Structures are given as C-alpha cells and as structure tokens.
Amino acid sequence: MSKILIFFIILFSALQSYEIKQTPIKFSQKRVELTKQYIRQHYGLKVEDIKITPQIILIHYTAIEGFKKSLARFESETLPNDRPDINKAGSLNVSTHFMVERDGTIHQLMPLNYMGRHVIGLNFNSIGIENVGGEGFVENLTVEQLLANIFLVNYLKKRFETIEYVVGHHEYRCFEDTELWLEKDDGYRTKKFDPGPSFMRDLHANIKGFKKAPCD
C-alpha cells in the first residue's frame, strides 16, 4: 500500500465513527460448560467462569465470502462434523467476539469478557475479530474492513488497558515460547493463512501502541 494511501486511511479513520451492531450468537449455559471443559482439557485450568483478561487482539478472515454464511459457522454451540482438523480437540464450536462485513459493518457476536474458541493456544487471553472474505485463502479483505479494524483495535484498547498485541491468525505459533501460550497438547496445531501479511502490515501502519507478534 502506498504512503499516500496510508496517509488518507489514517486521516479518514481518525474522523470515522462506527456503530457496533449487536448480533449475538447462541451462548447458553451449555456453551459456557463446553468452554470450561475446553479450558480444562487444553489449558489445564479449572475455572469457575469463562471470563478472560485480554492481552491480544487476534485478526482473522472467515474464508467465506458472504456474511450470512460466515455467521452461520459460529451459530451452533457444538462443532459441526465437517471440521476434522479440530473436532478431535473437543465438541465446543468456534466463536469470535466480532465479525466485520466486506463493507466495514461491525457486528459483536458475544460478550467481550467471555473466552471464544478462535485460535489454538491463545483463546484464554485474546479477543477475536473475524473479517468476511478470504475464500480459497486469498488475501482479498477490503479497505473498508481495514478501516473498521483500525477503529476496533483502538476501541478495544480503550476498553481494556491490558491489551498489548495485535496479531494475525497466521502468526499464532509465534507465541509458543511465551507465557501467553497455554495449549497442553503438542500435537494440536493447524496451519493458518489468515488474514495474511499484507493486511497485518497495513493495519500496523495505521495503529500505534501495539506490539507485533514476537517472531515478526
């Protein structure tokens, strides 16, 4: 992305204000209990609730082009049968705190202080932002989504002073040798491409006060 375009993105994002639409996924006591089980199985922690203290903002793409189809992947409380890459790790369905449409519309899907299942090893200390797109593992997120993500990470920093990092899903394994990494199963890893280095480079060029992934 050119320096001129980055300048205009910074200028526009400083003036832009976003409505965060409340679009809750199903999160009954059943999902809470499944989350507790996941925490116990994968992190070795026995918890009374599923509240988190976020230190990382984790950026994703859905690998699906449509918002409704993307949202549908998170609705069920239990994991669908078509996820053989992760279903061996528990029946808790994936979840994320935010989803950003192609036009930059922001949806909050779940409470910000609840743990979602959106990344191996780092769920217990991260807030997930899913961006609609990336089908076929193509880096095709929009400028509108970039602007919305700039707004969101700054908004979240104001909400949670504990947040230090903004990283892409493809960078999650950079944390394996840090105190933030909690996964106990050394065989539970998947290869991720989202949202891609270009989007993260452009995002970091337009935000301040956040650390990059430790191996960056």
Regions found by a protein language model. Name each.
Residues 63-67, 103-106, 112-117, 133-137, ...:
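Solvent-exposed loop/turn segments at secondary-structure junctions
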